[in-house]
Curated annotation (Swiss-Prot):
PANTHER family: 40S RIBOSOMAL PROTEIN S14/30S RIBOSOMAL PROTEIN S11 (PTHR11759). GO terms for molecular function: rRNA binding; structural constituent of ribosome. One of its GO terms (biological process) is translation. Keywords: Ribonucleoprotein, Ribosomal protein, RNA-binding, rRNA-binding. NCBIfam families: PRK05309.1 (NF003698), uS11_bact (TIGR03632). GO terms for cellular component: ribonucleoprotein complex; ribosome. Part of the 30S ribosomal subunit. Interacts with proteins S7 and S18. Binds to IF-3. Located on the platform of the 30S subunit, it bridges several disparate RNA helices of the 16S rRNA. Forms part of the Shine-Dalgarno cleft in the 70S ribosome. This is Small ribosomal subunit protein uS11. The gene is rpsK. PROSITE patterns: RIBOSOMAL_S11. Disulfide bonds: none annotated.
């Protein structure tokens, strides 16, 4: 039985001037997704996708590299201004934000959307190092 030819979808050049940057910074990784106003993903990157492994993924430098990569992809689509939504407790929050600003985006607003429980689930046990 012959395999069907796999079609490669060409990425269309959209002309989007403003969007939303979702920065999800966990203890282990930092993921950045840039979407349009409706929430459709335009560009994404993460520290792991940029080649960092293990504990190096959680560093501010890895977050900066991932944000620069994501910004470059979004600027190819004509994006100029961003709203930034930061989520999570990780160390890459501020450095990713600075990298987006340094890439030439006009940042209109910064929102922290980290979920905070109103005494919900029991938290993890404290680490003893």
């Amino acid at each position: 039985m012959a395999k069907e030819a796999v079609r490669v979808r060409r990425r269309e050049r959209k002309n989007i001037s403003s969007g939303v940057a979702h920065v999800n910074s966990t203890f282990n990784n930092t993921m950045i997704t840039i979407t349009d106003a409706q929430g459709n993903a335009i560009a994404w990157s993460s520290a792991g996708a940029k080649g960092f492994k293990g504990s190096r993924k959680s560093t501010p430098f890895a977050a900066q590299i991932a944000a620069e990569d994501c910004a470059k992809k979004a600027q190819e689509h004509g994006m100029k201004s961003l709203e930034v939504e930061v989520c999570g407790p990780g160390s890459g929050r501020e450095s990713a934000l600075r990298a987006l600003q340094a890439a030439g985006f006009m940042i209109t607003s910064i929102r922290d959307v980290t979920p905070i429980p109103h005494n919900g689930c029991r938290p993890r046990k404290k680490r003893r190092v």
